[in-house]
């Protein structure tokens, strides 16, 4: 889960090497996969059509993010 109370938690004090960026991207992908799992669980936990539509849309956007991050990793590798 994110560190929302600390507004500086995501700041990086220096430029990352490609190896460090690759590791960070793996962590980002992990977060996206967790979000997909949670949105999908919420989707299946409701019968409200509007909620289901919105949750499915958000879940599917996260899947796109995973693909984009993997594409970036392939580019950097």
Write out the residue ranges for each language-model feature.
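Non-heme di-metal
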Residues: 1-77
């Amino acid at each position: 889960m994110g560190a929302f109370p600390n507004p500086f938690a995501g700041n990086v004090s220096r430029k990352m090497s490609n190896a460090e960026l690759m590791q960070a991207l793996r962590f980002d992908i992990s977060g996206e996969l967790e979000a997909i799992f949670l949105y999908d669980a919420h989707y299946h936990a409701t019968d409200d059509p509007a909620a289901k539509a919105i949750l499915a849309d958000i879940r599917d956007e996260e899947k796109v993010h995973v693909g984009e991050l993997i594409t970036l990793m392939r580019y950097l590798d």
